[in-house]
Every structure is written in structure tokens, then in C-alpha cells.
């Protein structure tokens, strides 16, 4: 029996957004969960979700009158508690989280351009390097990267060798006595991480494999970019069929 790929993709988005288990997919609007799960595994292990997200990102940038690829990028990480164990699990002593970290690379519009998942006990400074290896061939216009003090050292040296400028923001610098002042550009990646964790499947790591964990992050990237294309706020609730 053949199933509609549109319905299968929406089934994956439903899981990412609602955070339910695979067997709880509503049968009325989605194909059997085994079909949706099989396709999700296949797409996660290939570059398909990455390609779809990048294509949507480029469409958003064209709509806003920007170049197709960004010149300014922002990096940050968010930790996920592991619920089921599996690959690459560690303890983040800083945030007191046992699980994984997602290194996220975005542009100034908040669109996701790369994701790298690793054990939470590994240093951001070293684990950001795979991001740079991935994005530089895909984003030839990249000229500068913003990140916080946790990336000072190896990450900065690596970018310097590639002739990409590094900007490290120091918390507390430039703050006024009147109250909190957001750090220039850095607040955008915090906003994107808030959008990511608004998808319940990414509030914690329920996946046993790295490919599945990154797959849900890329699905969220599709969700954010598609929402910007149709004029929907990324944090707004929507129907299941969003693409």
C-alpha cells in the first residue's frame, strides 16, 4: 500500500511538535506509525532533512530581500536530559544535566543552518568545530561568527585559520544600571533555542541514537522556516498539516 509522503512528513512533524510516542500517532490523519517511523529513520540518516531545511531557509531569505546564504552566523548549545539512554550520553556539570547537547548554528533571522549533537559532558569549545567543518562548504558568504565565552580557544583558533572573524560576547559588558540589556545578536540564538524547545520532543532527549536526535532538530528547522514563509509566528500553535 502506497502512502502520501505529505501525510508521512506531517506525521513526523506531529511527533516533534506534540512529543507523543510513535504508537500514539492519530490514525485518522496520519499513516500507520510504523510507516512514519521508517521514513523518519531513513530521512534522519540521510541528508534529506538538512537539504529541505536549507531550501526553506533560502526561500525565507529571498522573501525578505536577503542573499540566499548568510554572512553572519551565531552559535550556541542547549542541553537535553536523556530519558532512555543510548548513544553519546554524559553529565553537564555546569547545567547539572545528564544527557546530550545540541550545538546550533543560526543566521540573524533565527533560521537553523547546522546542528551537531554530542554527549553533554563534552566541551562546547571542541564540539563546535564539526559545525564549522559542515557549514563552510555550504555557506561560502560566511564572514563572522558570534558566540559566548565557552567557545574561546579551539573554536576561535579554528575559525582564524579559515579566515572567518570571531566575536566573543562577555556577559555583563555594556550593561546599564537600569536593568537587563540583551547582548547584540546573541539574543537571536537564545530565541531560536526557545523555539526549538517549544517542540515537546526536544524538551528532553527521548532518542537512543544521535541521528534521531538531530533529525528532530532538523524537523524543527523546517517548521520554523515554513512558518516564516507563510507569515506564522514560530511559537504559535498550528494545525498538524504545516507544510
Describe each PLM feature range.
Residues 1-243:
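Short alpha-helical elements
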Amino acid at each position: 500500500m502506497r502512502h502520501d509522503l505529505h501525510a508521512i512528513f506531517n506525521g513526523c512533524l506531529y511527533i516533534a511538535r506534540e512529543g507523543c510516542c510513535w504508537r500514539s500517532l492519530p490514525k485518522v490523519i496520519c499513516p500507520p506509525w510504523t510507516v512514519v517511523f521508517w521514513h523518519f529513520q531513513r530521512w534522519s540518516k540521510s541528508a534529506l532533512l538538512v537539504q529541505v531545511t536549507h531550501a526553506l531557509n533560502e526561500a525565507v531569505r529571498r522573501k525578505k530581500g536577503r542573499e540566499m546564504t548568510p554572512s553572519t552566523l551565531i552559535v550556541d548549545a542547549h542541553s537535553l536530559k536523556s530519558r532512555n539512554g543510548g548513544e553519546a550520553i554524559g553529565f553537564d556539570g555546569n547545567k547539572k544535566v545528564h544527557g546530550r547537547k545540541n550545538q546550533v548554528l543560526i543566521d540573524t533571522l533565527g533560521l537553523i543552518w547546522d546542528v551537531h549533537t554530542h554527549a553533554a559532558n563534552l566541551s562546547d569549545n571542541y564540539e563546535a568545530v564539526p559545525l564549522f567543518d559542515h557549514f563552510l562548504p555550504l555557506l561560502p558568504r560566511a564572514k563572522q561568527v558570534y558566540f559566548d565565552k565557552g567557545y574561546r580557544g579551539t573554536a576561535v583558533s579554528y575559525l582564524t585559520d579559515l579566515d572567518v572573524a570571531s566575536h566573543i560576547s562577555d556577559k555583563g559588558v555594556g550593561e546599564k544600571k537600569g536593568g537587563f540589556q540583551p547582548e547584540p545578536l546573541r539574543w537571536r540564538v537564545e530565541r531560536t533555542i526557545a523555539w526549538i524547545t517549544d517542540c515537546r520532543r526536544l524538551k528532553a532527549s527521548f532518542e537512543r541514537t544521535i541521528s534521531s536526535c538531530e533529525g528532530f532538530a532538523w524537523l524543527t528547522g523546517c517548521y520554523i522556516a515554513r512558518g516564516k514563509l507563510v507569515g506564522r509566528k514560530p511559537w504559535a500553535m498550528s494545525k498538524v498539516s504545516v507544510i
